[in-house]
């Protein structure tokens, strides 16, 4: 259809609350929990094959996280650990359709759960080392779409573009009091 044949407007609004609790111990060890609602507005697809594809709905999610931030040896060692769970409704998924382009469609429901851990060490005032690891299990709970006239069920499949494992290892060195106009220079 040409753009002149479509005369629609969409209006979206959403309340997105966040609730959190924190406990800071006498040894500067932090423990926390949070619950928050996420939202992404719907919209129009520029390219589409049929009338069902020219609009897509808003997506909603509830995010749950618990974690801790710990420090030891006068802050020379620190560790952060968090567990998370995300319950998604109407997740917006980009589909590439040959000869048409990209079309955004809504998945029925998906969930994402995992763990993130990071460690920092400061052997000297100038030298820092960092290690980060993340594990994510992100899957469709309910998602069906029609491909070439056949209804396909993606329940249990992994979400696209979400790595299961992430890892980084970095180090940095800072030079202090180099001159009067540079307080610190850090190389990573």
What are the functions of these language-model segments?
Residues 2-5, 46-52, 98-103, 149-157:
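Extracytoplasmic loops and strand-loop junctions of Gram-negative outer membrane beta-barrel proteins
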């Amino acid at each position: 259809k040409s753009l002149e044949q479509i005369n629609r407007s969409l209006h979206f609004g959403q309340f997105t609350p966040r609730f959190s609790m924190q406990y800071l111990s006498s040894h500067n060890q932090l423990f926390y929990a949070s619950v928050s609602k996420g939202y992404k507005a719907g919209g129009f697809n520029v390219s589409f094959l049929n009338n069902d594809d020219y609009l897509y709905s808003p997506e909603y999610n509830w995010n749950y996280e618990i974690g801790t931030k710990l420090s030891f040896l006068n802050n020379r060692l620190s560790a952060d650990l968090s567990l998370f769970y995300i319950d998604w409704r109407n997740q917006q998924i980009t589909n590439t359709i040959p000869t048409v382009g990209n079309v955004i469609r809504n998945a029925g429901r998906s969930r994402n759960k995992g763990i993130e851990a990071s460690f920092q060490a400061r052997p000297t005032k100038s030298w820092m080392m960092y290690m980060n690891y993340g594990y994510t299990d992100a899957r469709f709970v309910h998602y069906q779409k029609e491909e070439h006239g056949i209804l396909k069920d993606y329940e249990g499949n992994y979400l696209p573009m979400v790595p299961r494992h992430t890892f980084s290892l970095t180090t940095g060195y800072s030079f202090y009091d180099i001159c009067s106009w540079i307080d610190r220079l850090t190389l990573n």
